[in-house]
Amino acid sequence: MISFLDKAVLQFDRALQTLVPHAAKATRPSPANTLEEAELDQVERKHSSGLMRINHTGEVCAQALYAGQATTAKLATVRQEMEHAADEEIDHLVWCEQRLYDLGSKPSILNPLFYGASFMIGAGAGFISDKLSLGFVAATEDQVCIHLQKHMAALPMQDAKSKAVLTQMHIDEAKHKAMALEAGGYEFPQPIMAIMTQVSKVMTITTYRI
């Protein structure tokens, strides 16, 4: 059985990997690696950077959410599911970070704040019940999939590298949503989903610019 201290050390290490630039390592190569860099003007590059910054912060939040849930999950199987999903999300984190630097930009300075808030939400959900915790994962991944679809449509047409990253992320996120529901997650009602959408707008509006 893992002690509370062991959990704290593991989660501190995960936080450092998430928040320190270039600290995390992907297990899969970025889908953008095989594509040529497109010619983007200043406005297009700034727009692509803003969208990828939002997606990078979304992955920071996902890492924190899963970390919080894994810390308080009651069943070992649920904790393992959370940790496995977080490991897959690291690929997304690294891909988005890499793409940001390729575009001449950088991650949001607000990431530590969003990480802390997401960790507390995840830990709170896990403390209440595993069913709620898994349901929150499913609802969050549903929101992420919607954002990704919008961003893929909003990217400059010639920015194939960013679109390739978001396309693979969308595939993975949909899988994580299905996994959470199959594991017994609670399916949130539409009013709750609407509230989550409004809350997520705070993150997207701020991180697009900073």
Curated annotation (Swiss-Prot):
It comes from the Bacteria. Pfam families: COQ7. Pathway: Cofactor biosynthesis; ubiquinone biosynthesis. Its main location: membrane. One of its GO terms (cellular component) is plasma membrane. Binds 2 iron ions per subunit. It catalyses: a 5-methoxy-2-methyl-3-(all-trans-polyprenyl)benzene-1,4-diol + AH2 + O2 = a 3-demethylubiquinol + A + H2O. It is an enzyme of class 1 (oxidoreductase). Its EC number is 1.14.99.60. It is a peripheral membrane protein. Its cofactor is Fe cation. Fe cation 2 binds at residues 89, 141, 173, 176. Belongs to the COQ7 family. This is 3-demethoxyubiquinol 3-hydroxylase. It comes from Marinomonas sp. (strain MWYL1). The lineage of its organism: Bacteria, Pseudomonadati, Pseudomonadota, Gammaproteobacteria, Oceanospirillales. The gene is coq7.
